[in-house]
Amino acid sequence: MNNNLFEGSDDDGEDLQLSTNKDYAKTYNILRKKELLQKYKDRGLDVSESEFDSDSSSSEEDEVDPKFDQDFFKTLSSLKSKDPCIYDKGTKFFSESSGDEDDKDGEAPKKKKKAKPVTLKDYERKVILEHNGKFESSDEEQQEKEHEELQRAQSPSAVEEERRLKAEFRKVMNKEDDSEDEEFGGIFKKRSKTKEQTAAEEADFAKWLAGKQAEIQETDKKQLEPLKQYWSSNKLTQGESFLRDYILNKGYANTDESAIPTYDEIVGEAAPLSEDEQELEKQAEFEHKYNFRFEEPDADFIKRYPRTIEQSLRRTDDKRKEKRKELKERKDQEKQQKMKELELVKEMKRKEIDEKIRKLKAVTGNDELGFRDEELEEDFDPAAHDRRMQELFDDEYYNVDEGEEKPECPSDIDELVLEDWDNYDPRQHANGGGEDYEGHCEDDDFNMDCDYDPSTAKEQLQQELIENTRGRKGRKGRRNRFMEMIQAEKPAFNPEDEKTYSEYIDEYYQMDCEDIIGDQPCRFKYVETTPNDFGLTIEEILLAKNKELNQWASLKKAVQNRPEHVEKKEQRLYKMKAKNEDLKRKIFKSLYGEGSDDEEQPAEEKPEVTPAEATAPAENGQVSTEGLSKSKRKRLKRKAAAAAASAPKVLKEESDSKDPKEADGSTEDVQAESSKKKVDTPSKKGKDDANQETKNSPQSTEKTKNNNALKNNKKEPKNVQNGFQKPQNQANKSAKTKSNQPFKTTESAPAKAEKSNGNNPFNKPQSKSQQRQELPPIHKNQGGNKKGPRNANGTNPFKKSNQKPSAPFPAKKTNNFKAKNKQNNNSGITDDRLKAYGINPRKFHKREKYGKKDN
């Protein structure tokens, strides 16, 4: 055994004791200390309890030493890296004084081991040996005096004193105060680290060794690098990983007894619980788990699970998935192969078209083929096409020198001609200058035989050929078939049988496809639709408002895809509808400058009217329209025109109830009124200024008289029933009085008055069908009866009264509606035209045939 193991002990061999049971020895030492303490207290000695503390350094295990840990890590690193120094006998891995932290400076003297604490037993032994058991302070003072005298007698010289001072000073500089009880220590003292700093450095050092920290400030970093790489490796076994954590976390240290609890552990929530409290905590935790055993943990957390779990212990069965994947890949490959085949076919088709174009260019001698690319993209114009043809194929086209030369014939051209024996003529194919030519010795076919006779040779040759053909029937049959083919009539070239240039282009582009489903290529097809402008021009469509266009033709009807016959029918109906100018003016008000009914018109200034002037029009059955808006005045004008159209009905009834003279007078008045209405019917382009001029003219006075006469005639049947008849001159007088009133009214005022007058029995509201029936475009293009006034239906409202001006007897009451529409029976109005105007054809024909039902 190495003797160095016992070098640090100052005790003799007899003081060494062996302890077999640490707990028993610890208990015995405590009891012994208490016994000795009580003994010395009885003697009157002042001994503190700290002197009787147990010798923790000898009796208990040594404390954790950081220097020892570093030496241990260095040794372990050398072992793991298999450093050659581990095989050297003289290598020391652990220093003798491992507890000292400052054994790094070589200039400092070797530190002494920390002094052993003096116990009471040692102190008694020392007193007995040195002072014979006497505890007196006088002896100490005497000893000090003797020591001073001895030193004074042995005082050194000045040089020795200086040398001694320097040595002591150097000793003091390098000396460290190991004893905390000394009153004075060295001049300089190294600052010791606090407990927190030491713990932080140890934690960083442990993290660095475990591979959790990149850098660390350590002088032995290079020596400990192999251990760090070994412990931070991913291939570390479970046992080695446990050993690493056990060493770095100091699991071997008994920290439960020596640890000082914090403030929170003592008084706070982190305070250790007693056994009863721990038992209660366990019971509460078990009860909570039992009550909520059916609930999932983390109920407040939304769990998300992946569709495909990659890291799963279950054996995955993805055979069907692999088959689907293989099938998809195979389909994609087939699709790509078919697309390549289509590309090849498309390329061949393109080459075919290019070849045809090249031939056309060669034949025509024009690189552009007579047409430019821009002209091929434009719409076909026959006139432009004729002009282009005239420019291309003019006289200059045929006069151009194409630079053609006579082709050189091959050397055997004569032989090729002679092969056609069916049309062979010796006189046409003779060499030289005709029958008299006998040949020359330089000719290729010159016969050197002296017995050769050219005239007889030809005959012999023909005879020989005939005999040969007789012996070979097969050649004769072939020759006959060949002759039949030659003599057969060849078909003439028909351009319609050949494809056009556009058809070739269409075939080329039809080879493209968006996708291939199965074996069938799918292409996007365009649907050809019938163009329909809905009876409107481009200017009307662009300038009209969206609301007006939707009123003319709804957007739903314009965008939907309908059959061709329906589109053609709509096209025909809207062309007929477009001829109705009044309907266009009514719908497209923004185009004709009339504005919309929904637009707000600026309020016009109302003239100040006296009460007398205000009551005058009311008495006359007229209403002023100067304060009304423009749209309302137009509606009143239209109602006045409708009332004028219904006037013949009233006149017909009056003529039946009156005598012939009165009927003649009333007829004349009605004719004047009708002519006035026809001439002065308010047009939709009229303005207020024109109305003012008409009122101030002499014709307006005459018009007012006729209006009053018409009103009197309308009221006359009521008076006749009551037994009296109002004189006509009185009506004219009242009309003249009313016309001279200062308050002016518009032309639509009588119609307004008639509407408000409830006593008028002939003022009946017109139905919607009658208003649509009276639209002028239905009879717009009819000829005949052009002269004279016409009503809204285009018929003469006074034709009935003109045919029968006087009746000796009261005429039988007839149906006004039927009589009014008699001229329309032969008008030839189709049902489609009636539907275009929103009229039910069945009801319309019934009204024409039977008349309107009287209530």
Swiss-Prot record:
Location of region: Disordered: 47-67, 82-117, 130-196, 312-342, 424-453, 589-855
Coiled coil location: 307-362
Extent of the signal sequence: none
GO cellular component terms attached to this protein's record: 90S preribosome; nucleolus
KW Cytoplasm (keyword) present: no
Keyword Coiled coil: yes
Phosphoserine carried by residues: S95, S97, S98, S137, S138, S179
A Pfam family hit: Kri1_C
Biased composition (Acidic residues): 48-64, 441-452
Biological process, per Gene Ontology: endonucleolytic cleavage in ITS1 to separate SSU-rRNA from 5.8S rRNA and LSU-rRNA from tricistronic rRNA transcript (SSU-rRNA, 5.8S rRNA, LSU-rRNA)
InterPro entries, per database record: Kri1, Kri1-like_C
Keyword terms of this UniProt record: Coiled coil, Phosphoprotein
Polar residues bias spans: 720-748, 756-773, 792-805
Biased composition (Basic and acidic residues): 82-91, 160-176, 650-664, 674-692
Comp. bias (Basic residues): 630-640, 842-855
Biased composition (Low complexity): 609-619, 812-826
Recorded family membership: Belongs to the KRI1 family.
Name of the protein: Protein KRI1 homolog
